[in-house]
Amino acid sequence: MGKNFLLEIGTEEMPAHFLDPAIKQIYDFSLNYFENQKISFEDIKTWATPRRLVVYIKNLSEKQESQEEEIRGPAAHVGYKNGVWTEVAKRFAEQYGASLEALYIKETPRGKYIFLKRIKEGVNTLEILPDYAVSLLKNIRFPKMMKWGNVDFYFGRPIRWIVALYGSEEVKFEVAGVKSSRYSRPPRFLPQTPIEIKDADSYIDLMKENYVIVDQNERKNEILRHIKEIANSNSLTLSYDEDLLEEVTYLVEYPTALLGQFDSKYLTLPEIVLIVTMEKKQRYFPLRDKEGNLINKFIVIRNGTENYKEVVIQGNEKVLKARLADAEYYYNEDIRCPLEKYSEKLSGIIFQEQLGTIKDKVERVRILVREIANILELSTEEKEILERAVDLYKADLGTLMVSEYPELHGIMGSIYAKISGEREPIPQIIGEYIYPRTLEDQIPKNPLSTVLGIADRVDSLTGYFALDLFPTGSEDPIGLRRISGGLLRLLLETDFKLNLRNLFMKSFEVYKFSDKCPISQIEKGMLFIGQRLRNLLLDKYPNDIVEAVMEVGYDELWKLKRRVDFIREFKEKDPYEKLKRALNRLYRILPKDFSPKEINENLFNSPFEKELYRDYVKINKEISKEILKGNYKVLLGYDFLKEFSDHIESFFDHVLVMSPNEEEKLNRLSLLFAIKSLFWEVLDWSKLN
């Protein structure tokens, strides 16, 4: 039999982005804790609101399972002599209430010892729960931890109350000066009269009666239901970011949706300005008409009931009006000057204290863009377009709008470039180079935008690598994981024949770093990039394929992507298993540090090795050039591979590779090495399952 267990940690308001990671940690910790403690349960639920973190464990067993434990006693030579248990052994048995018949001798790394087994009765769950709760609270990590008062304890926000109930029984403990009890608190918008919770079973319904929907999924569904009702009843359509819904869910405990509006004159502002103002600044849901046009209405989610809703609506409308009036002012002021004028301000904006100004960055990126343009053999016109785009791509950082709305960098630059009369595709490049910013974003449509995006990210990463500003643990204040993820996607999802390591080396050269920033930091940076790349690939492809292609290098990502595409297709072909088996046999026999010699055909005396050499010459002549150019799919239609695989097997079955004749041995190993070198140019076949 079991009882339901409830733990509610009441806090001051937590930032919305703290909560989802926190409840995932709570779930994982709880699962591991009770499994390790051998306490069974039916299910674990974790919930969060701005003011409470909750774990609810259904049907938690009242007692640990009994466990058999093996106890080591004295050394055998002390406790067992001449076939008889000694007094030492008898005392050992008596100490644990066991008979002499229960003793046995067992070999250990330290010699032979006397052992006995006994059944250890499980402890009552109620006695274990205080340790669980305290350990849990000490183990939860937040993006920022804080300490309050004189208490030597860190948490996301100060803990103000704790509810801990096992069935109807209180679980007594103290953390951060707060004692557990059965009393919760209502939401902030109600008088703070404690809510007595009689038992864990009644918690959810009782909190709902007190205007707290504890389950975040239920809150999210309530928000969706309310906003859809408002939109449908007004013949409107919703327009919102999924992240906004997630954030608002964690900002309220009892959601109520209200419809507000703003002056239609603000609809003349760029749509993105209105959306960012409503979604990012105010957490409102924008609305559109049936044709998809943004309109001057919005939905706000209130934390509370519909009481005084007109006052709440008016208050939100007033705040939004002030925001939009500011945005209108910034926009009108900005468009008084051409975008180019704002480039003059970039020498006064710091990119990074040790890496110079934005103006410095622009000039470094210009050199990288030229380098990439030459490698890709772009036309004179394309190079001229890129030069102009580089002139302007950071200019909007000097505008009022982007100073207030940094997330609109690039987007406003594109809008202002059009207003300034810049010819296409320059505005498009300025607006697209920032993408992808997330895993969900598409890469730019214009290849020239991608060129600028690559150069910009390479410059940023090179600077941060040189200064050793790598992320530590979950902390990544600069956003290197995001920047590198964007760079990798740009290179993986295009077929640009670029060498990433060479780009970093060129960028390092452009920076003109002092000796305090050694070039070895680029190697460290490439390792960081490699780990990010591995993670990206593992989200889409099997582990063996990822390891096989990563092992042969990732400097040229266009080749890596082609390797992945090739092996995914080749695995379904007939020659795959035979070739993989033959190549792995070859791989295993080659010494790790083998240095090949020039192959001497005259030293081959077996028909099997002569045949294999002829195969190698044939393959080298017919497809090696294509393989070296990255055209790996040439192997897909190469019918000779099955026969070649048989010849490798025959070679191993009939030829003694490690001949006592040193000259013969080196010649045979050199042939195998040549074959390996050719096929390992494609991938590391030894990594494939």
Curated annotation (Swiss-Prot):
Enzyme superclass (EC) = ligase
Query: Which UniProt keywords are given for this protein, alphabetically ordered?
Result: Aminoacyl-tRNA synthetase, ATP-binding, Cytoplasm, Ligase, Nucleotide-binding, Protein biosynthesis
Which superkingdom, per the lineage?
Bacteria
Q: Which InterPro entries match?
A: DALR_anticod-bd, Gly-tRNA-synth_bsu, Gly-tRNA-synth_heterodimer
Q: Is the keyword Protein biosynthesis in the record?
A: yes
Q: Name one GO cellular component term.
A: cytosol
Q: Which reaction does it catalyse?
A: tRNA(Gly) + glycine + ATP = glycyl-tRNA(Gly) + AMP + diphosphate
Keyword Aminoacyl-tRNA synthetase, does the record have it?
Answer: yes
Family annotation (SUPFAM superfamilies): HD-domain/PDEase-like
Q: What is its main location?
A: cytoplasm
Example of a GO biological process term: glycyl-tRNA aminoacylation
Please list the GO terms describing molecular function: arginine-tRNA ligase activity; ATP binding; glycine-tRNA ligase activity
Query: Which EC number(s) are documented for this chain?
Result: 6.1.1.14
Q: Subcellular location, in the record's words?
A: Cytoplasm
Q: Which PROSITE patterns match?
A: AA_TRNA_LIGASE_II_GLYAB
Q: Which residues form a coiled coil?
A: none
NCBIfam families xref list:
glyS
Q: How does it assemble?
A: Tetramer of two alpha and two beta subunits.
- Protein name (database record): Glycine--tRNA ligase beta subunit
- Specify the species: Dictyoglomus turgidum (strain DSM 6724 / Z-1310)
